[in-house]
């Protein structure tokens, strides 16, 4: 409900080379680009969403664009739970587990000071995500985040084109004018886990989306440092996971239906 995932063809269609000139159409390039994708959001108001996921392919390389809080006009500071609340939640979760499960987990944990073990675990997680944030207040801000597993730096045009798209979409959808400038919706390159080869960019894009949905960012103090968001081993088995999912769906579709 809070998110919308665009098709992997959306950005390609938005940025498709324009062969017509302004004198032929009577409109600016931003309006002509929006015209090409205007029907892609006819059933959804993207400004009612907190997060917009846009897969981007540039020169055979995939990366993720995440537009956050597009309806906000300025950053907001809101209250967040404190560290004691997090500990209390974890304590409550432990109480609700079956005793046998708790004993099994206890026997599998390394021996040592429990507080140090918990501290070590939380230290490895980004401190801006829902599972590890211990701040009293957090920052929600309208922004365009880029998660690139190759840490490339040619994204300025991406920020510009998407700001223009949002501006025209707002005008068409809301019937009023609003500026989506660099000051009102900041662009930022996130520090994320990086690939160690030349072929896994698509897998990392999928993992960025999955990790955000499972352990979303809650404090948008830029730039986001998500280096420890997930281990590289998690991406290495992603192809096998996808293969098993495809085979599962295939079996479900080919099984004879009960009459």
Positions of the model-derived regions?
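Cysteine protease catalytic domains with a Cys-His-Asp triad
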Residues: 1-131, 139-143, 155
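C-terminal folded domains that constitute the principal catalytic or ligand-binding module
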Residues: 142, 150-153, 157-258
């Amino acid at each position: 409900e809070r998110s919308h995932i665009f098709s992997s063809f959306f950005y390609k269609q938005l940025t498709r080379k324009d062969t017509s000139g302004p004198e032929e159409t009577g409109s600016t390039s931003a309006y002509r680009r929006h015209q090409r994708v205007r029907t892609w959001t006819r059933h959804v108001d993207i400004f009612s969403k907190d997060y917009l996921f846009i897969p981007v392919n540039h020169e055979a390389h995939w990366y993720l664009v995440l537009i956050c809080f597009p309806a906000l006009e300025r950053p907001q500071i809101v209250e967040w739970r404190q560290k004691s609340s997090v500990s209390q939640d974890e304590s409550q979760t432990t109480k609700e587990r079956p005793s046998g499960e708790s004993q099994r987990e206890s026997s599998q944990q390394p021996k040592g000071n429990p507080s140090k073990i918990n501290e070590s675990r939380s230290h490895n997680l980004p401190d801006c995500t829902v599972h590890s944030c211990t701040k009293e207040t957090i920052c929600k801000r309208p922004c365009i985040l880029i998660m690139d597993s190759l840490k490339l730096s040619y994204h300025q045009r991406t920020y510009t084109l998407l700001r223009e798209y949002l501006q025209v979409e707002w005008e068409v959808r809301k019937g009023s004018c609003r500026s989506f400038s660099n000051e009102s919706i900041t662009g930022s390159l996130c520090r994320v886990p990086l690939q160690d080869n030349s072929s896994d960019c698509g897998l990392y894009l999928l993992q960025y989306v999955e990790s955000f949905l499972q352990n979303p960012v809650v404090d948008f103090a830029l730039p986001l440092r998500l280096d420890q968001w997930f281990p590289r081993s998690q991406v290495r088995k992603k192809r096998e996971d996808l293969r098993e999912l495809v085979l599962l769906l295939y079996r479900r579709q080919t099984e004879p239906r009960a009459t």
